[in-house]
A protein has these predicted regions:
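C-terminal and inter-domain tail/linker signature
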Residues: 2-156
Length: 156
């Protein structure tokens, strides 16, 4: 098992290793290439955001989620503080920062800084991501508006 600290500015990551695949996904997502980011996933995969209670098994929906995430939080920065890797997976402990613009008194808008820590558990097979699980505090992340775009409401 390897341990390291990384950011998205490491172009030397081998795209066939778990670290490289994770880096390729994050770099594509960070640069707004959500289709390229989704291409890092196998045809059969599960992406789960436990804080939001969302699960995706379809690349089209995953791509939509990644795009909306960038739209809602365009200044998002993710720093991987520690990465534990094996030959078929990665566990990444990360810090995410962003800004949320939200309504305030009298119809004004205010920018709320966000800083949240979390972990991603990523499993891979044949050079593609097969399972991705994110764990973080939903209240601190303030991503409820994003979650509402992907939850189906039912009337009582």
């Amino acid at each position: 098992m390897n341990t390291q600290t990384t950011t998205l500015d490491n172009p030397s990551a081998d795209a066939t290793t778990p670290n490289g695949i994770l880096h390729a996904f994050l770099a594509a997502w960070w640069h707004g290439n959500v289709g390229e980011a989704a291409d890092q996933f196998s045809d059969r995969f599960t992406f789960t955001d436990h804080a939001l209670g969302l699960e995706f098994k379809d690349k089209e929906r995953l791509t939509e989620f990644l795009a909306k995430s960038r739209e809602f939080f365009p200044d998002t920065q993710r720093t991987d503080n520690t990465i534990f890797s094996s030959e078929d997976g990665v566990i990444s402990e990360w810090t995410l920062t962003a800004t949320l613009s939200e309504p305030f008194l009298g119809g004004l808008m205010r920018n709320v800084p966000i800083r949240v820590q979390g972990i991603s558990v990523v499993q891979m097979q044949y050079g593609k991501i097969t399972r991705w699980s994110d764990y973080y505090d939903q209240q601190t992340a303030r991503r409820y508006g994003l979650a509402s775009r992907f939850t189906e409401w039912t009337e009582l």
